[in-house]
């Protein structure tokens, strides 16, 4: 009887981690407000988990949608003010809790992330300038750790939450003169910042230690540096915690995926694209994408990190790029071959339509934006849509 009891306790203790034992396929929610019905819609598309960033909920719709000034520039969701953390904002937490409850009611699992930490306000909420204070002052490491400890103590038993992603796209490199992995030497750079506030590994150790004082079971997910580039795995150190997953984002070549009507659509996939500060021409196809991801695969091999501890946490391209469907298909194929978890960006994002793949290659209608501004689901008409078909196929459950 005692053995059975111990077995039950062990199963219960590792339930959240057990979610990640098999490959999982998800998406990202980074909307202007809580949109509970999107959980149901995602579930209907076989999306197994949602990576949720609630930071935009702190801002007025006029600022997010109509290019009006930010009436609350010092207001940061949950943390109050990125200048100094003084405790979780109760009103914000109540809103987050209601959203997570809605996710659970609709059968969705959630990885919670944040776009800002103390001393690291999200660039888009910081006059489009990097906030690098956390990479220059250890006191912000400590504030970030206290924030996550406080949040984990409240969410550790929430059944929908299957991961804490400590910070979205960290960028200590920007504070210390490193910005182009195509031309700069990562080893040389890291040796110059190791054991300083710009050492991402130290920040993670500090936060993880704090979380584990109140929550021993919820998996923690950490991003690589320079906006979660695969190449920053070269200096990432595995944490001494078995409940940790390691994540990267994939929008490379950025010169391809970030094209839009304003920039123009110069490149297509597969094709030759100019990359890096020196604008080197490089051919991109499936093999080149796999080569770009090699630092992740090599790092995992060197450190004996299993495939089910690696997450392609964001990937995508502007849906109007020629060859977008093939780009997404090739990445999904690569992730599946490695056995990595993946989450495309994004599903029904309400502040931007560039990666709303259900729209295909069609511009949004006026009715679409009217519904969005009202916080309603826009009408979605069936279109000839190869890119969404790629995602639907990738999301199919393999029995």
Range-by-range predicted roles:
Residues 197-202, 209, 219-221, 225-318, ...:
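Glycoside hydrolase catalytic-domain groove-lining segments
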Residues 54, 114-116, 250, 317, ...:
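Short beta-strand segments enriched in hydrophobic/aromatic residues
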Residues 1-11:
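Acidic, proline-/serine-/threonine-rich low-complexity intrinsically disordered repeat tracts
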Residues 68-70, 128-131, 182, 237-240, ...:
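Short, hinge-like loop/turn segments at secondary-structure boundaries
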Residues 12-219, 224-233, 243, 351, ...:
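Active-site mouth of glycoside hydrolases
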Residues 174, 319-322:
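A generic structural signal for short coil/turn motifs at secondary-structure boundaries
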Residues 322-399:
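Aromatic-rich peripheral "rim/lid" segments of glycoside hydrolase catalytic domains that contact
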């Amino acid at each position: 009887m005692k053995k059975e009891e111990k077995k039950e306790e062990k199963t219960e203790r590792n339930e959240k981690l057990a979610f990640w034992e098999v490959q999982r396929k998800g998406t990202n929610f980074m909307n202007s407000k809580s949109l509970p019905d999107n959980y149901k819609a995602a579930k209907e598309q076989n999306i197994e988990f949602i990576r949720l960033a609630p930071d935009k909920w702190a801002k007025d719709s006029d600022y997010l949608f109509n290019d009006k000034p930010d009436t609350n520039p010092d207001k940061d969701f949950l943390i109050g003010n990125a200048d100094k953390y003084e405790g979780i904002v109760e009103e914000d937490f109540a809103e987050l809790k209601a959203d997570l409850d809605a996710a659970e009611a609709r059968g969705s699992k959630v990885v919670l992330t944040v776009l800002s930490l103390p001393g690291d306000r999200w660039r888009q909420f910081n006059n489009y300038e990097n906030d690098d204070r956390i990479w220059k002052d250890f006191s912000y490491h400590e504030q970030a750790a206290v924030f996550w400890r406080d949040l984990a103590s409240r969410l550790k038993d929430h059944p929908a939450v299957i991961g804490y992603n400590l910070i979205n796209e960290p960028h200590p490199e920007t504070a210390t003169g490193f910005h182009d992995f195509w031309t700069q030497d990562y080893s040389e750079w890291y040796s110059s910042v190791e054991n300083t506030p710009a050492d991402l590994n130290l920040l993670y150790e500090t936060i993880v230690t704090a979380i584990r004082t109140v929550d021993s079971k919820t998996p923690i997910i950490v991003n690589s540096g320079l906006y979660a580039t695969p190449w920053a795995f070269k200096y990432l150190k595995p944490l001494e915690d078995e409940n940790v997953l390691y994540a990267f984002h994939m929008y490379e070549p950025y010169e391809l995926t970030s094209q839009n009507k304003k920039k123009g659509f110069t490149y297509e996939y597969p094709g030759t694209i100019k990359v890096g500060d020196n604008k080197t021409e490089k051919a991109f196809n499936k093999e080149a994408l796999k080569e770009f991801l090699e630092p992740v695969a090599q790092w995992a091999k060197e450190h004996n990190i299993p495939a089910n501890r690696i997450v392609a946490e964001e990937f995508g391209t502007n849906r109007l790029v020629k060859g977008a469907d093939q780009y997404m298909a090739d990445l999904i194929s690569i992730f599946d071959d490695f056995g990595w978890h993946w989450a495309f960006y994004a599903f029904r994002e309400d502040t931007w339509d560039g990666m709303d793949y259900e729209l295909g290659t069609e511009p949004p209608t006026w009715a679409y934006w009217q519904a969005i501004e009202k916080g309603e689901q826009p009408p979605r008409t069936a279109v000839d849509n190869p890119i969404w078909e790629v995602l639907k196929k990738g999301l199919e459950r393999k029995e």
